[in-house]
Amino acid sequence: MSKYDSHLKCSFCGKSQEQVRKLIAGPGVYICDECVELCNEILDEELMENAAGMGMGRSPEKNPPKAPPEKINFEDIPKPREIKHYLDEHVIGQDEAKKVLSVAVYNHYKRLSLMEDDDADPVADGIELHKSNILLIGPTGCGKTLLAQTLAKILDVPFAVADATTLTEAGYVGEDVENILLRLLQVADLDVAEAQRGIIYIDEIDKIARKSENPSITRDVSGEGVQQALLKMLEGTVANVPPQGGRKHPYQDCIQIDTRNILFICGGAFVGLDKVIERRVGKKSMGFVRPGEEGSAKEQRTAELLQHLSPEDLVKYGMIPEFIGRIPVIASLSPLDEEALVEILTQPKNALVKQYKKLLKMDSVQLEFEPTAIRAIAQEAYRRKTGARALRGIVEELMLDVMYELPSRKDVNRCTITPEMVEKRSTAELLLHPSSLPKPESA
């Protein structure tokens, strides 16, 4: 031991090496075991305070218990026809998927009302109503996510939308599957009882398909591993949800949520699934189609093949049998044709054309789309093969110069979008105010 060792002391409390049990050395600093223990206590207190702020508090003064959620009256439950009618006002086509969703939501309400009825025993006759989770399959831009978002607006139960692409198996970089429940909890204002009667829509579920049909010796942490992690949640379990999101750790208090009564709706494009069905059914495309009809003929054939979808096709695609078994209801959405894109532009309550008319009305300008221009926009969107999502991009390109110029022009009261403008051959036609027109010269 050197002559300097006896003078070593803790850089925080100042105690010498002889006064403490252990002195830990760092680059030019020292900390004793007592200070380390004190730091741990401070961190634990801070974690508890943060958890209390997120609704986990144990102090009745700071966090009074929330009132139980209002019971669902069976007579007030929206009927399937009413739910579908509301969806029809906002989403074009996809009648079969709308019926599936309407019935599923209605039955979900009925299960909740039966369990919340104090005078009724849900299993008095030995019959217990189980939930039926749903899988929506359809190409990109056909309305899967929009259907879910529209449903959320009319429901009296919490509705959350989650993305499966960010999920990974526990212990790896990414989000735990419990973060899906955290989104529902946040929508329910951190009311656990309210969240436990909610609905969750998991988008891009096809992205967690395992990379190979055969089991691999390497871990598939964002595919099969996520499916395995979701199994109990879909079926019904008591999950531990970290109130601040992220990964769970031993020093963090978790909120327990029972998922037995949470309805799960999953959606995905499942690109290439038609090829899997085709190999099983044995249907091959034969014959000829007229020039220009190749795309529509292929989409029609894909839609027909999806009508023959069976669970074994999804297993071949990469979904594990246990996962498919927990989603008994499967609905296919059709690709959007040109006619449907025209209707999407004009008919829904929140149609794109109506949105831009409202925008220009705020500048005291009346916006008009010629019918042939709307048809040209739909044709261009159909060529881009991204469904209804392409419509906003096309209209935004068309309106950029108009929306840039009009706020500075007080002499314009009408703007007309023509098919030539859609085809990039001309600019929008602007109609001037009568007071702004040049006066005719006197003879």
UniProtKB/Swiss-Prot annotation:
Tree of life domain: Bacteria
Residues annotated to bind Zn(2+): C10, C13, C32, C35
GO biological process: cell division; proteolysis involved in protein catabolic process
MF terms in GO: ATP binding; ATP hydrolysis activity; ATP-dependent protein folding chaperone; protein dimerization activity; unfolded protein binding; zinc ion binding
Alphabetized UniProt keyword annotations: ATP-binding, Chaperone, Metal-binding, Nucleotide-binding, Zinc
SMART domains named in the record: AAA, ClpB_D2-small, zf-C4_ClpX
GO CC terms of this entry: HslUV protease complex
Binding-site residues, ATP: P139, T140, G141, C142, G143, K144, T145, L146
Keyword Chaperone part of the UniProt annotation: yes
Stated family: Belongs to the ClpX chaperone family.
Quaternary structure note: Component of the ClpX-ClpP complex. Forms a hexameric ring that, in the presence of ATP, binds to fourteen ClpP subunits assembled into a disk-like structure with a central cavity, resembling the structure of eukaryotic proteasomes.
Function summary: ATP-dependent specificity component of the Clp protease. It directs the protease to specific substrates. Can perform chaperone functions in the absence of ClpP.
Protein name in the entry: ATP-dependent Clp protease ATP-binding subunit ClpX
Native source organism of the sequence: Picosynechococcus sp. (strain ATCC 27264 / PCC 7002 / PR-6)
